Regions:
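Amphipathic alpha-helical segments of the small helical/lid subdomains adjacent to P-loop NTPase cores
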Residues: 4-15, 20-88
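Extended alpha-helical interface modules used as scaffolds for assembling large macromolecular complexes
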Residues: 78-247
Length: 247
């Protein structure tokens, strides 16, 4: 992401720079649109569909679910994350490329500092000054989440100038929730990830009893928080697990 810094003084040369971050004519300048995929990258889409052995239309929908959904102003076309999209085309498969590029240690520290729960990341409303703002003196985590790509604009009430912000796509949601596992569930991420996979398998074959049994067994291994926040802690554990399941 690109972090916004405040102009240092009224005489700063930075004042000569025009900020086009939320200007509609530049809405698609930092990413790739669906139209560009269907035209300029059509051969890449066909090749990916062939390698995944899926219809082209289905592959496009999967790409949208995983890497699409960014908006830097409103109205705006849906913007794909170019880093993840190009890696998917190059590898012939869909993976978690963005989170593979680095661990969001600073973000996790800030989530803890501002007391932001996993279930409260995204799904919020804000005016532009609350998120398109310098981060060096931020009093909340929204500017950092927005400018680093963890949340994006999803809607806008233009009459009142208030924006709806949310997590852009499945790649970001699942990657973010995986990074929260050590803080909220257990440092043994292997157990959590395999449990989630086995839960998905059970749900896919409509084995609700098996899914509940897996969930109960897993929760019995989560350290109990002997304080007034214990119930809320387990609520966040459930939220992370079901987010990892794509729900």
């Amino acid at each position: 992401g690109i972090t916004k810094f405040s102009q240092l003084s009224i005489f700063s040369e930075l004042n000569n720079i025009k900020n086009v971050s939320m200007d509609e004519p530049y809405a698609a300048i930092c990413g790739i649109t669906e139209d560009e995929i269907l035209t300029q990258m059509s051969d890449d889409l066909n090749l990916l569909a062939a390698r995944m052995k899926l219809p082209r239309v289905e592959v496009l929908e999967k790409l949208k679910d995983n890497y699409d959904g960014y908006h830097f102003t409103w109205p705006s076309p849906d913007i794909f994350n170019p880093f993840s999209l190009l890696n998917a085309f190059a590898d012939g498969k869909m993976d978690s490329y963005w989170f593979g590029s680095g661990t969001p240690t600073y973000l996790l520290e800030m989530l803890n500092k501002f007391g932001v729960l996993p279930s409260k990341i995204g799904g919020t409303e804000a005016v532009a000054a609350d998120f398109d703002a310098p981060t060096e003196h931020m009093t909340g985590i929204t500017p950092l989440l927005y400018q680093s790509g963890y949340i994006t604009i999803k809607d806008c009430d233009t009459q009142f100038g208030i924006y709806t912000l949310d997590i852009p796509n499945q790649e970001v949601r699942i990657g973010l929730m995986r990074s929260l596992i050590p803080s909220y569930i257990t440092r043994d991420t292997l157990t959590t990830n395999t449990t989630v996979v086995n839960l998905a398998r059970a749900l896919n074959r409509d084995d609700m009893d098996g899914a509940l049994r897996l969930l109960q067994e897993f929760l019995s291994t989560v350290p109990y928080c002997d304080n007034v926040r214990s119930e809320g802690h387990f609520q966040q554990v459930f939220y992370i697990i079901f987010s990892l399941l794509g729900m």
